[in-house]
């Protein structure tokens, strides 16, 4: 099995892991109700997806 020859310092480890952070998700705007929602999902405020009513949403 492969074993590292030398120890990696904490700084070197953190530099390598600098790209592992979570990225913020982008928001799209619903064409029906103009609310922000996550792309490729049903709009949670009106229930539309791709211009079609997919589910009914109860108004509060």
Curated annotation (Swiss-Prot):
Organism: Chlamydia caviae (strain ATCC VR-813 / DSM 19441 / 03DC25 / GPIC)
Entry annotated with the keyword Endoplasmic reticulum: no
Similarity-based family: Belongs to the bacterial ribosomal protein bL32 family.
Region of interest: Disordered: 1-23
InterPro entries per record: Ribosomal_bL32 (IPR002677), Ribosomal_bL32_bact (IPR044957), Ribosomal_zn-bd (IPR011332)
GO cellular component: large ribosomal subunit
Signal peptide, first to last residue: none
GO MF term list: structural constituent of ribosome
Keywords, alphabetical: Ribonucleoprotein, Ribosomal protein
Top-rank taxon: Bacteria
Name by which UniProt lists this protein: Large ribosomal subunit protein bL32
Pfam family, one: Ribosomal_L32p
GO biological process annotation, one example: translation
């Amino acid at each position: 099995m492969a074993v590292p020859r030398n120890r990696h310092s904490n700084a070197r480890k953190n530099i390598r892991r600098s790209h592992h952070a979570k990225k913020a998700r982008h928001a799209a705007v619903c064409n029906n109700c103009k609310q922000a929602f996550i792309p490729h999902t049903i709009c949670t405020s009106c229930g539309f997806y791709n211009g079609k009513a997919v589910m009914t949403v109860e108004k509060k």
